[in-house]
Amino acid sequence: VKLYTLILATILSLSNFLSAQDYIWPLKLGRVVSSNFANPRPRRFHAGLDISTEGKTGHEVVAIDSGYVERIRVSSDGYGRILYQKLNDGKTVVYAHLDGFTDLLNEIIRFEQKRNRSYDVDKYFRPNEMLVNKGDFIGYSGDSGGAFGPHLHFEMRDTLNRPINPFTNGFGMDDRHRPKMDRLAVIPLSPETVINGVTLPQVFPLHRKSAALYEFPDTIHVFNTVGLALSAVDEITGFAIKYNITGAALFVDDAEQFRLEFDHYSFTNNHLLEMSVDNSLRRLNDGNFHRLFVISNETKSDFVKGSSHGRLSLSPGYHSVSLRVFDHAQNVTRIQGTLYIAPPTRVRAEILSEKASTITVAVYPDGSPFPITDFVCYAFNAKGYPEVKVDPISKEKSDRALVVELPKKLTRNRILQFMGINSLGGVSEAYHLPYKAEVADHMTTPFQLSVSHLEKSVVIEVAARGYFQQAANLTLKGSKLLNLPLKQVRPGVFHSAPLKPQDLAEMEGITFTVSGAAVREMRFRFNPELSVGAESAAAFSIDGKCVLQTTKQTFYDTTAFWIEAVENPVSLETGRFKSKVYQLQPFDRALKDSARVSIQLKKSESAEKMGIFYYDQKEGWTYLPSKLSNVDRLLSAPLYSFEAVAVIEDTVPPRIYDFFPGQNASYSSTDFTTISGKVEDDLAGIGKDKDIQMTLDGESLYFEYHPIKKEVRYRLDGFLGAGQYQLVITATDQVGNRSTKEITFSVN
């Protein structure tokens, strides 16, 4: 029976493979793919391939196999003009961002637009109503919808309507290049975790030994639970384009701990992108790192295979780590390295002697019997900025110490930061040694407080510009009183030990104390809210005018969240701030579902022409769909990430310009086939194509509005008769500013 089953499975697999290989390419162009399956996009995975059309529209798109047209859809956003084809093998194929369809389908669209009095069309067909043979022309490539340039977006979906990877389902590319590795991140997954002497996530470069093999830069010293995340790309022979990898597997001591395969997924799990590609590292501009672990089954995407979770809680000692990263053509790259599991260690350093151009420093183990065999040293200036890595002129062992000779030109008037490495591979916490450097005055230097929210813990930071030799500690006043000694992890930067988010419950404030010959106390107002389990919660700004509301669905796990006032916000080119700017925190926390921010207006103030905006690094101040409650004068908006927000007044109407036809112009009937122009709003923006109206002699036109190019386009159905015409364009931005342009023209 087993043999029969194996033979049958082999036959079916071969049959599916041969069937898949029989598909044809959807464009009559060379195979150039600019973006592949599961590439990270804002809060979603890329569901298919972006196929290059050489920067032009109008290339013929053909059916990859026989079947029927299941659906056509037309809109001004998203995928624009889309055709869904049901193949005879049961799969669905999507051709998107099209410029147009067949003549028959274009006629059906025009009929539906007139019938529904809307540009938007969503038309379904019965099975076999619109038959299509392999290679049949089905439309033209374009840049419709939210496309950033001409290309064909191409998807394949299985019988459950799940996107599947075209590269592994009949559209593989000739590829002899192995995936390229970049960096490895080690993520703390418990409040007790320490990584190379540090409690925050650590990112390590990977050393290339060959095209097929990369290595850790050194043994990584870990204490307690961690997860690994990988920054890697794939390259395809003949193209200088970075692609998403097809999969990766993590092994510890030759046992598989985690497997990731970008084969298929459900649209309902798109939000898990931010738990699959590390959201914190991405928001901190470190790039895209594929997590090789899951926090819980709730955060497990369809790409995670098997029952292993990848959270590494390893026994003390050395553990070999191996990663196998592969592409769709089964080109494989390996990464290998070692994790050393042991409690964190400390060192101390002292200057033994000086010469004309060098100083001699001894680095001792502090509280450990294991000798120091190596070290890393960085020089910081008196303001606490790192300037240079200091390499030794010489080094030698002396009992358990390491004695090193360092150049004076790199160390004089600087703070030296030492991390010792002992004979077992343990990496110490940082130790600071000033060498003829100015020490900051702890009584007058201003300090700032910030908080980092990790996966399972919270780290409080107090920082200033300078180096301090005094001891420092925090007192947290909340549901319980906590006294926390601080460590100076860099000159002028003090960190608490990691706390559980629950330790911040009912927090009223934080007192920072620096103890020297004189004692200085600073009080910081800090009032986070705690989201736990099935409860909704709300955090308020210190001034009480901004509130951040969460539901039981907002977070994946217990989270402390709070609001900070922004002292020096990014300025406005147009418009006026009508509130303070508030930073919602933790800004790098992945959200499962939406939260709601509300900002209170003055009682005497109208909300006309106002809205809540957030700051986007690429787009600048960006409008959020806002609603006013007249009862409490709160302007509110939903959001899916924590941003800097403010109420902004925008009184500038949209601009309507560069229109064809021109004012008082005359055209021949056969040359007049399209009406086009620009409609643009600099601040609040145009929300939807329905916020623009266009009439020709009083009759509504059902036009396309391209949200990226800010372009209106209407294709005439036939030719205009001779005579004079009036075109009227009206545009309203998202806070109600309106513009109207009237164009009179004639046709011969």
Where are these regions (language model features)?
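Proteolytic processing hotspots in large secreted/extracellular or virion-associated proteins
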Residues: 529-538, 565-616
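Contiguous beta-strand segments within globular domains
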Residues: 206-250, 354-362, 451-461, 589-597, ...
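A short beta-turn/strand-edge loop motif at beta-sheet boundaries
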Residues: 220-222, 238-244, 366-373, 410, ...
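Long, low-complexity serine/threonine/glycine- and acidic-rich segments characteristic of extracellular
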Residues: 133, 174, 189-192, 200-344, ...
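Surface-exposed, glycine-biased beta-strand/turn segments
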Residues: 18-93, 99-104, 118-128, 133-134, ...
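C-terminal beta-strand-rich structural cap/linker in extracellular carbohydrate-active enzymes
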Residues: 412, 634-653
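Proteolytic-maturation and junctional protease-sensitive modules
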Residues: 471-476, 550, 587-643, 689-693, ...
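Short, compositionally biased P/S/T/A/G/V-rich stretches that sit at domain boundaries
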Residues: 164-221, 338-360, 434-453, 648-668
